[in-house]
Design a protein with these regions (language model features):
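N-terminal lobe of the biotin/lipoate ligase/transferase fold
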Residues: 1-85, 146-150
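Short loop/edge segments at beta-strand edges and connector loops
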Residues: 7, 93-95
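Long, positively charged amphipathic alpha-helical accessory segments at protein N-termini or as interdomain linkers
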Residues: 24, 63-91, 101-235
Length: 235
């Protein structure tokens, strides 16, 4: 595993995408990012004290792209378990790509594919302070515990946990992984709104299905939301 460290960079994920000699588990770490982003191209505002990192994952030829659509969920439970190894707090997984603590976002995940690699980008609020409107919707590990952490220790713990969960995934243990995810399903039983092109549907979130879709119960029917096809909001 090669490690690339930066005090500042545009994006750790973009750095890895630009590399010509990509290798499995190449890891890029930055203190700050100037052009970090989340799903749908949303800007990801970075601060010093965050864990900002991305790594490469070589595509396994015998795993279908449909199976790999579950990778954000596998990454999510890996981050959650990694954080729980550091502090035994009640972390939750919010479908499809966030970790929550005390009803606030503490981590965002972005999984992208380039050629025969996945680029997995992760941003975790660790030692950074949060003020203003951001403090109403996000939190950091230090805010919950009052402690300071060695950021790279957090990164390597999360990466170690990812390798364990990914090995389980490759060994056919997806149903067991999914059960763990659903036990930490932040949206379950919450009223949410699915938002598409010129339409909205309100419903109650249920479990995450075996294919990675989120169950939604509306007044008329039970439906399933696909990863990446819609976005959602909730009260």
């Amino acid at each position: 595993m090669r490690i690339f460290r930066f005090s500042e960079i545009d994006s750790t994920s973009d750095f890895l995408k630009r590399k010509d000699d990509k290798r499995d588990y190449d890891l890029a770490i930055a203190e700050t990012q100037t052009h970090g982003r989340g799903r749908r191209g949303n800007n990801w505002v970075s601060q010093k004290g965050m864990a900002l990192f991305s790594f490469l994952l070589k595509v396994e030829e015998d795993i279908s792209i449909e199976e790999y659509s579950k990778l954000p969920l596998v990454t999510g439970i890996a981050v959650l378990n990694g954080l729980k190894r550091i502090e035994n707090l009640d972390f939750k997984f919010k479908w499809t790509n966030d970790i929550y603590l005390e009803d606030k976002k503490i981590c965002g995940i972005l999984v992208e594919k380039i050629q025969d690699f996945f680029v997995i980008g992760i941003g975790i609020n660790i030692n950074n302070s949060l003020e203003g409107a951001v403090a109403d919707i996000a939190t950091a590990l230090t805010i919950s515990t009052g402690k300071k952490y060695i950021v790279e220790d957090v990164i390597f713990t999360v990466l170690d946990e990812f390798k364990k969960q990914y090995k389980r995934f490759l060994c056919g243990e997806w149903n067991f992984i999914l059960e763990e995810i659903n036990n930490k399903n932040y949206l379950k039983n919450r009223e949410i709104t699915l938002v598409g092109n010129n339409w909205e549907i309100k419903g109650i979130a249920g479990d995450i299905a075996s294919d990675g879709r989120l169950e939604i119960v509306t007044e008329k029917e039970k439906m399933f939301a696909n990863i990446g096809e819609i976005h959602l909001k909730w009260d």
